[in-house]
Amino acid sequence: MRTAITQLVVVLSLMLASCAGYAPHDQLIGQDRVTLVAAMGQPERETTTGNFKKLHFVRSPSGWDTYFVYLDENDRVLRWEQVLTEDSFNSIQPGMTKDQVVQILGATKITNGLARNRGSVWHYRYENPQCESFLIEFTPEDTIRSTEYRIRSGRRCKYVGIG
């Protein structure tokens, strides 16, 4: 009996630890980079803007969020934000480049090519009551041709490939 309880405690602890690593939390503010990476895992990308570094933590295709964590010149966490929001999506405009999109939304792991080499589509899933996704269509020159919100079919919010 005692072994079963011990095993249950270990399993529940591991489950809690895996949930804690999905998103940043305010206790990370002021912590160093080593502590951040221990809590969140390795960032997908790192960019430098002005006096701070921006670390991208992309949680797709399984997750619905992308977090940017900002570090100061001493590699300490200044702040964090979840960037897959309608305000961010609405700032994406035709003519922008893929790199500009990544600076605003982070990279996506859900991409599809268009027939006859007409470009590609990036697909961002995000948390919302309508089960919408945000799609960005790029030209072969890697600039935005169009964007759209798409409601996923079916009763559950789950990934449906772009056809």
Please provide the spans of the model-predicted regions.
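A structural connector/turn signal
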Residues: Y22-A23, D87
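Bacterial N-terminal signal peptides that target proteins for export
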Residues: M1-V9
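N-terminal amphipathic/basic helix or basic patch
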Residues: V9-V10, Q31
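Generic anion/oxyanion-binding catalytic loop in active/binding sites
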Residues: L8, H25, N90
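Short domain-boundary/entry signatures in modular proteins, especially
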Residues: W80-S91
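A cross-family detector of function-defining hotspots
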Residues: A23, L28-R76, P94-G163
